Amino acid sequence: MAGPVSLRDLLMGASAWMGSESPGGSPTEGGGSAAGGPEPPWREDEICVVGIFGKTALRLNSEKFSLVNTVCDRQVFPLFRHQDPGDPGPGIRTEAGAVGEAGGAEDPGAAAGGSVRGSGAVAEGNRTEAGSQDYSLLQAYYSQESKVLYLLLTSICDNSQLLRACRALQSGEAGGGLSLPHAEAHEFWKHQEKLQCLSLLYLFSVCHILLLVHPTCSFDITYDRVFRALDGLRQKVLPLLKTAIKDCPVGKDWKLNCRPCPPRLLFLFQLNGALKVEPPRNQDPAHPDKPKKHSPKRRLQHALEDQIYRIFRKSRVLTNQSINCLFTVPANQAFVYIVPGSQEEDPVGMLLDQLRSHCTVKDPESLLVPAPLSGPRRYQVMRQHSRQQLSFHIDSSSSSSSGQLVDFTLREFLWQHVELVLSKKGFDDSVGRNPQPSHFELPTYQKWISAASKLYEVAIDGKEEDLGSPTGELTSKILSSIKVLEGFLDIDTKFSENRCQKALPMAHSAYQSNLPHNYTMTVHKNQLAQALRVYSQHARGPAFHKYAMQLHEDCYKFWSNGHQLCEERSLTDQHCVHKFHSLPKSGEKPEADRNPPVLYHNSRARSTGACNCGRKQAPRDDPFDIKAANYDFYQLLEEKCCGKLDHINFPVFEPSTPDPAPAKNESSPAPPDSDADKLKEKEPQTQGESTSLSLALSLGQSTDSLGTYPADPQAGGDNPEVHGQVEVKTEKRPNFVDRQASTVEYLPGMLHSNCPKGLLPKFSSWSLVKLGPAKSYNFHTGLDQQGFIPGTNYLMPWDIVIRTRAEDEGDLDTNSWPAPNKAIPGKRSAVVMGRGRRRDDIARAFVGFEYEDSRGRRFMCSGPDKVMKVMGSGPKESALKALNSDMPLYILSSSQGRGLKPHYAQLMRLFVVVPDAPLQIILMPQVQPGPPPCPVFYPEKQEITLPPDGLWVLRFPYAYVTERGPCFPPKENVQLMSYKVLRGVLKAVTQ
């Protein structure tokens, strides 16, 4: 054979001239078919098969194929990558009887010649799924002179293939285009080790001698578990391999043991400058001490042999009977060879010295070599003129004048074992009292090709998907047996699993610590985060994510199995205390014994509240729905207290069908500010005109009208005409659109500025009640109702000036000249202001903003954040300040509890005493129960004209709910003025 070839190409070419089916059944990548090749002349030669595997260093020329160059004393493999620019790589060519001649073998990492399984058209296997790409390459070279067939394995342990795998991981090819996380990346590398073990199993099944190459001078202990894994895998798949070669023309013992003999394993270590022998410091260089019998390299060799043998005996990789072992080592021969390192560590300097030596050839030498050399002769001349040795370049033996035993060369080391094979003596490596002879067979080239092809089909090149064929079935069974390797190879995962399994109970304890019997999702997540912190402190390795997911599942199962608290929150932001339950249906009774139980929500929180008019108080449960909060509680008290009082009812939904449907949760957004400004510019308001919306507009008949909330702050201020001190009744502007409320769909919540158009709720959350005539309120004693803190039950006076004109001033125009003997009206009124005005020019109303806390304590406020406190016979402060300001919806209660948590009181009622006078008091409540973008809530009838001579009570909603959920009361450290009743709640209009 003139050059190295891919083992797959070699077996394909041999199968062609043997008349059997090709392993892959496809032409070679080199471009020609193997079927046309003649029979090689060495087909009947008895051959010795030597397999080479191991790791390579990062240094130049440390690849394993340099070893074959040294042993064969010729340039079989190229010294450097891409030596010839037009080299197509190893392929099969029929020239001078060669089965596979290569013009120059390419680097093992390249894809030419069937280099990588699953990466090219011709591959060493067909496992091409994402993450299972095999980076192992088997190359073959037959030396006809020495009758030795070299099989060279380049795998993930070599730099070129390792670099390809790392690039695949980095680019995402191994993960289907995505970057793999730690656990999947670890699984990728372990899978590559398993595929490498299949290639090693093949070498251990077809070779007589195996060379393990290592780039350092210390033994890698990980080979111990690799060999134990291979031994276990071989015992597992041995029946399958027997089936594969049962028809091959080999001996009975070969068919029985699936190998020509127990292979002998030899070790090659590289020094790489690590071993340096220097004379002692005090020794005279002229009179050195007597040298020892063995050189330092020989002593290192013996030490490594003893260490390796002891390790393999302890782990029972080597036993007394060699026939039962994966491999053997000789008892009376050297099986470790130390390859000396180069004196020149700098690869660039080494190349420059090589170039310089070739450029300075002497004349006598040029006569000996008259023409340019190439091929093997060129390699020998390079060796003779080389000043520096390559990594595997070994000098010939020579005598030593110092008396030390001379170290043999690499070829001499290997050939003492090869000769035992070629002479058919075999290996007698069994030890002990009763050693059993091991089988041995020296096959011919043709017989070896026959057996090697069958094993190659099922172990490496077989297609697992082809289950219909015997080869595909055997391949499937062999690949399923790879799981045997996990206990040996995946030590990291095994350690990680043990570590994570020990961390799980600690994480479970951290999760269950200080837990109530039932708890919410928020508590579950907090406890799970604490458990994950404890778990991450102790868990390590690739199994971390797997057991973290198991921790998630375990904690969720514990929580959902009888410990799950109802997630529903009341309208006051309190959790339901029941465990997970369902609500009773219409007409169904609660059943606590069912699974899940049928119960109403209950937070076990109770408060005290007053009825619509405020005269009667009663305890109330914490509400969970808007109807119970704003309607049901007050309806129960209505029967006992307020039922006989006069009411102003707000419009509600009146169905026209027996089964009305709630409206969908689609909010009508408020218009932008620019549109609202344009609307104001187009329709200027006259003095005293109402800024509130009529009932038709409040039902959503105009989108622009909904954008006016909150009211324009410029409309307020200190102008008394705006807030009702004196206003002249003018003609109202007409509605934009006349539209009736829907009688098919109802509003499921409360009416607010973002509600859909034309919808009404089924019940009103507001109430307007008349307690009695205006004289029923005593200015000196205040309101006589339950729950008021002493001194806070008074209403504030509101003096409204009624403009009355005398008969002689009726036709007077302020813009015209005054008549003779008539005074200017402005001046006359200024003169008469002090004493001449009549008593009916001023009407006195009374206003009170009542706040109520959860304990039923009530008090009035005379302004924002100012609790009323009357010490004498009535309040002296006017109601103008409160009417001209945004009143807070919540305020700190005047009587705080003992706890640190602040106690809030809520604005619940507005008391208005309307005098019997020629004026109208219009009620326009607007509440914003939260910071923006919280909408503005208002009653179903926005402008309510209060009849004269009455004491009226407007009861505000207890809770505010939108389609997105309830507007909860404020928490600690929250600006209370973000929760407010907008200014302009009352307006007086003179008649």
Curated annotation (Swiss-Prot):
Protein name: Nonsense-mediated mRNA decay factor SMG8
Segments of skewed composition (Low complexity): 95-110
Keyword Methyltransferase found: no
Organism annotation: Homo sapiens (Human)
GO cellular component terms, A-Z: cytosol
Modified residues (Omega-N-methylarginine): R898
PANTHER family reported in the protein's UniProt record: AMPLIFIED IN BREAST CANCER 2-RELATED, NONSENSE-MEDIATED MRNA DECAY FACTOR SMG8
Basic residues bias (residue ranges): 290-299
